[in-house]
């Protein structure tokens, strides 16, 4: 029986893994945008776009490879929500993706973060940078993943979860 509980975003807290590289993930129906942070958690940058692959699971395998290659301490997956704090099928899909990814990369934690407006913000930023709509298709998912991860990094700073403790 499918899980019908509405997924909710996580918040940085006492279970923060501390200093280390993080991945941001923007889950779409066709593509997945991936970003990473520097080890100090200051800046998110684009990494790549991965095609969704329900049959072969190459999307999960590629993200797991990145987690290992980059020594990632935490993965942040965008949770699409509407203006009324509600969730729909996209949010359930992202939450299911995050849950399965978490099982595959354990013990690395996978968090959900509110991603309202990230794609819109990414489109605007790319447009302002002179990137045409047609050219955005290949990088918009990465730009959204950057926005998702950067928001998480800023939440961590506001909560004092930088992991600077010895």
Swiss-Prot record:
Coiled coil regions, renumbered to chain: none
Any one GO cellular component localisation term in the record: cytosol
Where does it localize? Cytoplasm
Q: Could you list this entry's UniProt keywords, alphabetically sorted.
A: Cytoplasm, Hydrolase, Nuclease, Ribosome biogenesis
Keyword Signal on entry: no
Q: Does the keyword Heme apply?
A: no
Q: Name one Pfam family in it.
A: RuvX
Region Disordered, residue ranges: 1-24
Where is it mostly found? Answer: cytoplasm
Family to which this protein belongs: Belongs to the YqgF nuclease family.
What's the protein called, per UniProt? Putative pre-16S rRNA nuclease
Q: Which organism is it from?
A: Mycobacteroides abscessus (strain ATCC 19977 / DSM 44196 / CCUG 20993 / CIP 104536 / JCM 13569 / NCTC 13031 / TMC 1543 / L948)
């Amino acid at each position: 029986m499918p899980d019908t509980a509405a997924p909710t975003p996580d918040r940085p807290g006492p279970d923060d893994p501390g200093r280390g590289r993080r991945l941001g993930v923007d889950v779409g129906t066709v593509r997945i945008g991936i970003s990473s942070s520097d080890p100090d958690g200051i800046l998110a940058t684009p990494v790549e776009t991965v095609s969704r692959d329900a049959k072969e699971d190459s999307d999960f395998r590629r993200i797991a490879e990145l987690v290992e290659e980059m020594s990632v301490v935490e993965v942040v997956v965008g949770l699409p929500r509407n203006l009324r704090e509600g969730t729909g099928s996209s949010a359930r899909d992202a939450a299911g993706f995050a849950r399965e990814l978490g099982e595959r990369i354990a013990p690395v934690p996978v968090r959900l973060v509110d991603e309202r407006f990230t794609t819109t913000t990414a489109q605007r930023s790319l447009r302002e940078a002179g990137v045409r709509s047609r050219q955005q298709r290949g990088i918009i998912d990465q730009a959204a993943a950057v926005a998702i991860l950067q928001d998480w990094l800023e939440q961590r700073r506001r909560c004092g979860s930088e992991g600077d403790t010895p």
